[in-house]
Design a protein with these regions (language model features):
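Bacterial N-terminal signal peptides
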Residues: 11-22
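Long, low-hydrophobicity ectodomains and other hydrophilic envelope-associated domains
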Residues: 35-235
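Hydrophobic alpha-helical segments
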Residues: 22-23, 70
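N-terminal secretory signal peptides that target proteins for export/translocation
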Residues: 1-8
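Boundary at the C-terminal end of the N-terminal hydrophobic targeting segment
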Residues: 24-28
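Plant-biased recognition of short, low-complexity, intrinsically disordered N-terminal tails
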Residues: 31-32
Length: 235
């Protein structure tokens, strides 16, 4: 058995345990239930699909389709399909929070390394396994791929968000068992909040709250995109 096969089996097992545990413990104490996690489908030796998310285990990348929201100011990079925070989020991803988190587990991101913010605008930076965020759009041969930071503008300084690794925090479960990322409908944020699954550890993003806007000149609202998360080696 190859090392990659062993890794694949380990990741699938980890994913299955998380799904089972998350489904068990994420049951709220009201009639509303969390979304059912789609089955993990194998597309090739190192390629998987879960719902609308493509997973490349070898490259340690996940990609999910979405649409650019037409909003004024940003607090979140990506929200869930039908998520409550779409009015202040850059991209509506075609997935729910539980499925998105499951896909990230499949590329080896580990919540055991995370320091999750304990409040909105937490002054203590979040920590976690590092990742890069990329956006793809258009058709070949004009298809473009840029880092997400190039699309997030600080209106005060007229500069883009500084490039650097984002971190996997995994969100958090509330006392009643509900998964906060699913409850709030947020996947990726930059204001040091306990809700999103991926956060920006930089202080500059929090300090620029209220001034971060989408670069509409580079990528217009309504555009269909691929949101890509690439896991990086843990230092």
């Amino acid at each position: 058995m190859t090392p990659c096969s062993v890794a694949n089996r380990f990741l699938l097992t980890t994913c299955a345990v998380w799904i089972a545990g998350g489904t068990l413990f994420a049951q709220p104490q009201n009639p509303a239930s969390p979304p059912a996690v789609p089955p993990v489908e194998r597309l090739g030796e190192n390629r998987l699909r879960i719902g609308h998310i493509q997973v490349d285990v070898a490259a340690r990348e996940v990609a999910v389709t979405g649409q650019v929201n037409d909003v004024q100011f940003l607090e979140w990079v990506a929200n869930t399909a039908g998520g409550l925070k779409a009015y202040e989020s850059a991209i509506t991803a075609d997935t729910d929070a539980i499925t998105f988190n499951t896909a990230l587990l499949l590329i080896g991101l580990d919540k055991a390394h995370a320091r999750v913010p304990t409040q909105h605008f937490d002054p203590v930076p979040p920590r976690g396994d590092p990742a890069e965020l990329w956006i793809e759009w258009g058709e070949a041969p004009q298809r473009k791929r840029v880092r997400i930071e190039q699309l997030l503008l600080n209106k005060r300084t007229n500069t883009t968000l500084p490039e650097g690794p984002w971190v996997y925090t995994g969100s958090t479960f509330l006392a009643d068992g509900r998964y906060m990322a699913e409850l709030d409908g947020v996947l990726i944020g930059f204001v040091h909040s306990p809700a999103p699954i991926i956060e920006n550890p930089g202080a500059g993003a929090v300090g620029a709250f209220g001034s971060i806007v989408w670069n509409k000149e580079l990528l217009a609202p309504g555009t269909t995109v691929n949101l890509i998360v690439k896991a990086l080696p843990v230092q």
